């Protein structure tokens, strides 16, 4: 898979996910970055690195809809936002929770950026997805559904995200934007449900694709 120039991710973009993590949705989008080198493809193995042994079990799944920027753009009006989207992908924002919260001083980037921590499907052209704000999304772990929602439940819709992210900041062609995950992540459960060696995690999004990855511990 081609390495994108940037991966921008949105946190707390589904109210039910914010609630399960003990937080609230924000008045403005919560924005963080993932290392572009974290990308991998459908069918590749998610490898939990040895460094994730620090902090105990922690590697989590987050099924998400992603979109790709078609051309360099800046200060895009919300009314024109959809014109700069090349297409959509199914993504899994794999997250090492201890590194996300404690191991890196409270900054999300490192815990989200280990190699293979951003599996994605191939691009589906924007014209093939009539309404990206009405897509069923489902995450399945070892045959059991763990997340199920619809993209219409996003707090900040895609049009707004494009306009907001491009304010004063150039989005380069090929930039990937992950739009957030709904409730059901492993960290929000009692007891927590984290990925482990031998697991299979799937993310399905209607009209966009089906992402399947096995998990291996390094």
Task: Set out the residue ranges of the language-model regions.
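Short helix/loop capping segments that flank catalytic or ligand/cofactor-binding pockets
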Residues: 18-19, 42, 76-78, 98-100
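Residues embedded in well-ordered beta-strands
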Residues: 64-68, 138
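Active-site-proximal alpha-helical scaffold in enzymes
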Residues: 16, 68-71
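Extended, compositionally biased flexible segments
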Residues: 1-64
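Catalytic-pocket segment enriched in acidic/His residues
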Residues: 17, 23-25, 49, 97-218
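Short helix-to-loop capping/linker segments positioned immediately adjacent to catalytic or ligand/cofactor-binding
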Residues: 54-57, 73-78, 124-128
């Amino acid at each position: 898979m081609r390495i994108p120039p940037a991966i921008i991710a949105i946190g707390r973009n589904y109210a039910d996910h914010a609630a399960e993590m003990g937080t609230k949705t924000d008045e403005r989008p919560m924005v963080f970055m993932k290392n572009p080198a974290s990308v991998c493809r459908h069918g590749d193995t998610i490898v939990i690195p040895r460094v994730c042994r620090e902090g105990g079990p922690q590697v989590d799944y987050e099924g998400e809809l992603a979109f790709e920027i078609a051309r360099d753009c800046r200060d895009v009006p919300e009314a024109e936002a959809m014109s700069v989207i090349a297409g959509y992908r199914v993504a899994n924002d794999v997250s090492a929770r201890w590194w996300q919260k404690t191991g890196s001083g409270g900054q999300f980037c490192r815990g989200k950026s280990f190699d293979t921590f951003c599996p994605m499907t191939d691009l589906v052209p924007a014209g093939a997805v009539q309404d990206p704000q009405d897509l069923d999304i489902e995450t399945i772990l070892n045959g059991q559904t763990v997340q199920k929602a619809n993209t219409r439940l996003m707090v900040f819709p895609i049009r707004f995200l494009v306009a907001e992210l491009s304010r004063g900041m150039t989005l380069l062609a090929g930039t990937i934007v992950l739009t957030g995950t709904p409730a059901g992540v492993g960290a929000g459960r009692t007891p927590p449900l984290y990925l482990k060696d031998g697991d299979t995690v799937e993310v399905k999004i209607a009209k966009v694709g089906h992402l399947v990855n096995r998990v291996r511990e390094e």
